[in-house]
Amino acid sequence: MTATSSQEVTRGATRHDGGRFRRFRTVTKWLLLGLVLLLTLGLAGSLINHWVKTPREESAYPPPGQMVAVNGHRMHVYAEGEGEQSLVFLAGSGTTAPALDFRGLYRRLSDDYRTVVVERAGYGWSDDSGGVSRDIETVLQETRLALREAGESPPYVLLPHSMSGLEALHWASRYPDEVAAIIGLDPATPAAYESSPPPRLKVALVTFMSRTGLLRLVPSLCDGSPSVSHLSEEDSEAYCSLMYRRTMTADVRAEIDVTQANAELVAAEGVPEVPFYAFISDGEGLIDTWNEILVSYAEAAGGQHQVLDVGHYVHSEAPDLIATEVRAFLEQLVR
């Protein structure tokens, strides 16, 4: 074969390879465009479904408690029981339906106590605050006013879950006469946030899924919640509805942004002198030192604690045990 013939063969092979590459690139481009189109249509369908269902669900599942005016917005306060001691339940960060989330526990206590759940702005049936600061002092004043407007009066036994442990400790420091005791349901203490920055990526992802209705495509998130096992079918539907449309609201995100600052303020106030009992989870899914921090705090407070072999939502996973212990603890206080 001459040099010229060899060059022609090479050019032919190159043209052939180039043609195959262009065809591959074209096919890939159309596949990607098709995928983008499918995702766009799917997202649009999810949004439309969400927009249609949301007002229907708001009408179908009205608030079971009182709506009271606080600081330019309305807050939902649910209460039952007529006992002399008032137990006030405070929800952890992102709990979408506190009035239903705590039901497994307060239904086991409301025969003997006044049980009250305050839903902070942006939670459950409460309105969004409209941009009002979520610093711990503002949140506490709103909680106190909501209780007063709902006809409740201190002193209160506070039962905070998770992040609201900070609010309970701040409350006891600022207004000791209003807090008879703190019974923490795997409550957070300031040290839990010293080296725990906000999970911004997770917050952004969950916010996107909530706003676009994509959470509705994952019903296991609701059905698998330990709280649902304590609810009727209708209340379970209301719980799921609130989860789909009230997860990661603007107020919840604002709370997360100021959590570390709130923790620093509470830490500076020291350990309040108030009867203290902490029910502590197995720590799964939390920071590695969660249990150690809580045990240390309970001991520093001169209080009691019990480590349970259950997840973070201790009040839903071990309500019988906790109700029994709450009664025994409160009976000791009045002797």
Describe these PLM feature segments.
Residues 2-87, 110-113, 151, 295, ...:
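Alpha/beta-hydrolase fold catalytic core
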Residues 73-125:
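Conserved HGGG/HGGXW glycine-rich cap/lid loop of the alpha/beta-hydrolase fold
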Residues 117-159:
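Active-site loop/oxyanion-hole signature of alpha/beta-hydrolase fold enzymes
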Residues 120-123, 187, 310:
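Active-site loop/turn elements of alpha/beta-hydrolase fold enzymes
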Residues 153-196:
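Conserved hydrolase catalytic core segment
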Residues 185-219:
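A catalytic-pocket lid/entrance helix-loop region that shapes and gates access to the active site
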Residues 231-300, 309:
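Conserved serine/cysteine hydrolase catalytic core
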Residues 300-335:
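Catalytic active-site module of serine/aspartate enzymes centered on a nucleophile-bearing elbow/loop
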